[in-house]
Swiss-Prot record:
Residues 91-137 form the F-box domain. Pfam families: F-box-like (PF12937). Directly interacts with SKP1 and CUL1. It comes from the Eukaryota. CDD domains: F-box_FBXO36. The gene is FBXO36. This is F-box only protein 36.
Amino acid sequence: MASWLPETLFETVGQGPPPSKDYYQLLVTRSQVIFRWWKISLRSEYRSTKPGEAKETHEDFLENSHLQGQTALIFGARILDYVINLCKGKFDFLERLSDDLLLTIISYLDLEDIARLCQTSHRFAKLCMSDKLWEQIVQSTCDTITPDVRALAEDTGWRQLFFTNKLQLQRQLRKRKQKYGNLREKQP
C-alpha cells in the first residue's frame, strides 16, 4: 500500500531557537531522515563554516536520541511525533489524497461528521467549507436545480443555499428576480 507514496514524505524548514540564526531543514523520505543545517553568523570565524547534513535510516533515527532532541528543539514536539510515526510506517493516507477525491468522499458523510472533520486540520476545514463540496451535497439531495436556484447559489454560496429553508429560499429567489428584472427594464 505504501508503494504509491511519493519519495519525499515530509519536508520542513526552520530557524534555531534564539539567539541562534542558524537555518535547518528536515526531510523524511521513504527510507531516510535527512537533517541539514546552515550556520548563520556575523562573526568572521564562523563565515567559512560549511553546511552540515546527517542522514539516518528510519530505524537509526528511532534510536538516535540526540537527533530526535535537535528535531524537537528546532521544529517542536508535534513535528518530532509526526516524524517518529512516519519512521514507524504510520502514514496519514487520508491527508495524501487529492482534493477532488476527498470532496467526493466527504460528500457522502453526515452533516455532523462534516462538522467534526472540519475541525481536524486547515486542509479539511477548507475542503468542508468549499462551494464545490456543498454544490455536490445540494445536487445529491435535490431532484432538480433550476437555473434561478443555481444563479442564487453562485451569488450567496452553495453552503448558504443548503442551510436556507424553503420559505426563505423562495423569498430570496423572488427578490433576485425583481432586482435583475428591474435592471433589465432600465437598460435601453
